[in-house]
Amino acid sequence: MRRYEMICVGAGPAGLAAAIEAAKHGVQVIVFDENDRPGGQLFKQIHKFFGSQEHRAKERGFSIGNSFLNEAKELGVEVSLNSVVLGIYENGAMNVMVKDRIEQVMAQKTLVGTGASENMIPFPGWTLPGVIGAGAAQTMANIHGIRPGNDILMVGSGNVGVIVSYQMMQAGSRVAAVIDAAPEIGGYAVHAAKIARTGVPFLMSHTIKEAHGSDRVEGATVIQVDDSWEPIAGTEKRFEVDTICIAVGLNPMTQLLRMAGCKTAFVPALGGRLPAHDLNQETSVKGIYVAGDVSGIEEASTAVIEGRIAGLAIAHSLGYLDEPSFREQRTQQYASMKGLRSGSHGEQRGKAKEYLNAVMKGTMNAL
């Protein structure tokens, strides 16, 4: 059995940030990721980040990912790809499938940064080829250079929906419309404005009624909904499309954490059932930490900061970082996080995180 001081499950922005922060202080770290390349969602993000320079504004996601990989390599972080963690057991033991063999490893501290999967919605024809998640479309276009379709209907107007719509147009596809059952656009205005300027219609208070086609998508019908989300008869509109992209939110991938016995709570504002954790990102199971979308759906910049906080906490708990230095550096990360949890969207997520912290402390009951 191989033993490590710290194991990171997931080589996305949260996992890499945690690994880098811990390794800076001397912690021995290995990162396992099921994919054949590290970086998580960053390498699909060809758009520029916005906000402050501190949060990598005006940099594209893939360039940020490359900088993380280079820094991790320089610090001696080991990255094991095509490696699936099958389970986390007592005392930090894990089973990992590395390519075609199963290995047993053990960690003094574990960081779970497994991210999230895409939500889907059922409707007549939803299993036809051509109905795909928006994230899958983004992977096809930005990672593999394959255009998902020629004519696309986007279901969902959150950040993922509007960003991927624009990227599909950059890839040469036509976006027939962006629809959403909500009455207002959910994505940031800076992203939605790019779509609006191209003339693509936003149909708010609309949902998809049916996908048409026999062996593939050949069209889609949408319908308006009322304030109670009920379809309004006679408001149907048909679009001739060959692809329907679904962008209706993400679901945190908490399977390993639930297997390990971590306390959870249901928090709709952050994506569903999540691991309760303290301000150091540590869960109810001592030695298991979380960061990124698995601990609540937020931005990539937030995932990075959470990863850094967890990395600092792990370095401190292993004796590599003294108390004053730990508190000072953690305070700096909290201050950086505060800027991301401002505004209407950010404040809501911040309050939801406070609830998870309260569940962890036992001052509130989990739903």
What residues fall within each predicted segment?
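FAD-binding core/adjacent interface of flavoenzyme oxidoreductases
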Residues: 1-9, 66-151, 227-234, 245, ...
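Beta1-alpha1 glycine-rich phosphate/pyrophosphate-binding loop at the start
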Residues: 4-63, 148-191, 266-271
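Short, charged, surface-exposed secondary-structure boundary motifs
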Residues: 141-145, 185-191, 211-212, 274-278
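A Rossmann-like FAD-binding core segment of flavoenzymes
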Residues: 67, 72-88, 94, 169-258
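Conserved acidic residues
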Residues: 5, 108, 176, 242, ...
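FAD-site-proximal beta/loop scaffold in flavoenzymes
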Residues: 133-141, 243-295
